[in-house]
Each structure stands twice: as C-alpha cells, then as structure tokens.
Swiss-Prot record:
Keyword flag Transferase: no
Alphabetically ordered keywords of this record: Gluconeogenesis, Glycolysis, Isomerase
Binding site for substrate: 8-15, 21-22, 60, 87-90, 98, 114-115, 183-184
EC number: 5.4.2.11
Gene: gpmA
InterPro entries named among the record's database cross-references: His_Pase_superF_clade-1, His_PPase_superfam, PG/BPGM_mutase_AS, Phosphogly_mut1
Active site: residue positions: H9, E87
GO annotation (BP), single: gluconeogenesis
Top-level class of the enzyme under EC nomenclature: isomerase
A GO term, aspect molecular function: phosphoglycerate mutase activity
Pathway: Carbohydrate degradation; glycolysis; pyruvate from D-glyceraldehyde 3-phosphate: step 3/5
Protein name: 2,3-bisphosphoglycerate-dependent phosphoglycerate mutase
Residues at the site labelled Transition state stabilizer: H182
Length: 228
C-alpha cells in the first residue's frame, strides 16, 4: 500500500477578499501561512514522509509546499513545478469580486460558471494584460496551450496527462509523493482516482491547507481517502 498526499494551498489574499483568482499569482495571507505550517505539523505527527513533491508554477502553491517541507525538515526534497497543476483559469472573471459578479450577472449564471463541469466563464479578450502569453514561466508553450478561460473539464484535461507522465511512475517506483496545488487541479486528480461523476466532483470541496490522503494499492486504485 502506498500513501499519496494532496494539499490545496493555504488561504490566499484573493481567497480572503473573495475574488476570482485562477492563474493570477497572489500571495498567501498570514492565515494561509499558518495553515501550511499546521499541515506540515499534522503530517509529521502522523509519521508521514516523502521522496518526491509536485506543485504548480503559482507561488501560493509553491510557498505552501515549502512551508510544509520546512516544518517537516524536508526542504531538500526534489520538487517538480509544472503549469499543468495550476488552478483552473477563470478567464474574464479573474480579479472580480464573487458577490459583485453575482449581483451583475445573476447568482444562477455565476453558479454555472463556477460549478458546472464543462461550461467555462467568458474568455479574456485578445491583448488583455491578464493573459499569460508573455509570462516567462510559460515560455515554450504554444498560444493554443495557454488558456483564455477554462471549464473544470478543461482543467482536468491538462492535469491527467501530467499525472500519467510524471506522478504515477514515481508512485509505481515506490516513491512517496506529496502534491501541493489548487482546488480545481486537485479536483481533477480526485475525480480520476476516486472515479467520481461530473456531478459528484463539482460538489467536492477541498479546504485550504488540509492534507487529503489517498491509500493506493499496487494498481494505484484507492483503498481509502481521508483528510488529516
């Protein structure tokens, strides 16, 4: 049996301000830092250890991972950063207040954008400064690979190839893996590992800074799933 640990980043500044974040690179709050440290303490107290780590290229997930590893005295562990573990891209909603957006477009429409499986928010227009095209961390990616908006389905479609290419082979080789990422990219992994339906995964909540543990058999099928 192998244990895989997933952790959503600690509370971010835009989580606190109730803004759509997506690919916007925002900092952790003091609470978010405390959540990450507490996660490391829980993992350490429960006897967890790791051989390899994965995270996105967004600093709220990177810093959460670093804080967890620092608390566990494991900052030396190898870490792979990949854009495919980024949060779902929220398109034209990024930077907008969720309550104000609901007042403008209607609660039902915003709920569809946020919680439907295959309906994305409005895309960012060409030339918008929020587009990731000129960002160095995405150098080498084609314009087609970089989203202007994403549904959860789109997010899952980029997360799963990374799982199969980079994470699953490490687990099969006996490595203990920790993944620090985002609510929707982690939903993609949960949907795949647990075999959840589109309806089930859109309602599955992953709190900030709380480790989600999978116990996997030799075929990487889950035998248990629980929050620490």
């Amino acid at each position: 049996m192998t244990k895989l640990v997933l952790i959503r980043h600690g509370q971010s500044v835009w989580n606190q301000q109730d803004l759509f974040t997506g690919w916007t690179d925002v900092e952790l709050t003091e609470q978010g830092v405390a959540e990450a440290k507490a996660a490391g303490e829980k993992l350490l107290a429960a006897g967890y250890d790791f051989d390899a780590c994965h995270t996105s290229v967004l600093k709220r997930a990177i810093k959460t991972l670093n804080l967890v590893l620092e608390t566990m005295d494991r900052l030396w562990l190898p870490v792979q950063k990949d854009w495919r573990l980024n949060e779902r891209h929220y398109g034209g909603l990024q930077g907008l207040n969720k309550t104000q957006t609901a007042a403008q477009h209607g609660k039902e429409q915003v709920h569809i954008w946020r919680r439907s499986y295959d309906i994305p928010p409005p895309p960012l227009p060409e030339g918008d400064e929020r587009l990731p095209d000129g960002d160095r961390r995405y150098k080498g990616l084609s314009k087609e690979q970089l989203p202007r908006t994403e549904s959860l389905k789109d997010c899952v479609a980029r997360v799963l190839p990374y799982w199969h290419e980079s994470i699953a082979p490490q687990i099969r080789a006996g490595q203990r893996v920790l993944i620090s990422a985002h609510g929707n990219s982690l939903r993609g992994l949960v949907m795949y590992l647990s075999g959840l339906s589109e309806e089930e995964i859109t309602g599955f909540e992953i709190p900030t800074g709380r480790p989600l543990v999978y116990e996997l058999d030799d075929a990487l099928k889950p035998t248990d799933r629980f929050f620490l």
